[in-house]
Amino acid sequence: MLKTTGAFMMCLLLVSCSGTKLTGPGVKDGQLAPCPGSPNCVSTRAQDEKHRMDPIRYTGTKEQAHQRLVKVIASMPRTEIVTDQGDYVHVVFTSRLFRFRDDVEFVLDDAEKLIHFRSASRLGYSDLGVNRKRMEEIGKRFAKTTLP
């Protein structure tokens, strides 16, 4: 059992460290960068099912949605808000075990009352669904979060 676990962890490490680092995050021409071909990225702007997720819907003002989003992010472990410009928030999530860093970007679209996002691993090819699960969790927490 211990050998199997050790072998699995070694394979995970090798798969995660292979590949190239993603290009820098940010909004380009008003849009989040597209996901690469690898499965370690999800985005509300992706056209293919492998990478596509629905945006987070909100009611109220953009400022209230922003406050709720930041509150959710701050409640999650191993997070660092790198950039917070109101309409755009860039967060780095660090994994507990191997300290892998994932870039998550949010863009608030007040006209549509949507929060678009892109969540991508910096290294490797597969993330075993971590980015998708994280964004599903953020969406659930956002829906339950209220402001005082």
Positions of predicted regions on the chain:
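Bacterial N-terminal signal peptides that target proteins for export
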Residues: M1-G6
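Classic N-terminal secretory signal peptides
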Residues: F8-C11
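C-terminal motif of bacterial Sec signal peptides marking the signal peptidase cleavage site
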Residues: L13-S16
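Ser/Thr-rich, low-complexity intrinsically disordered terminal regions
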Residues: S18-P148
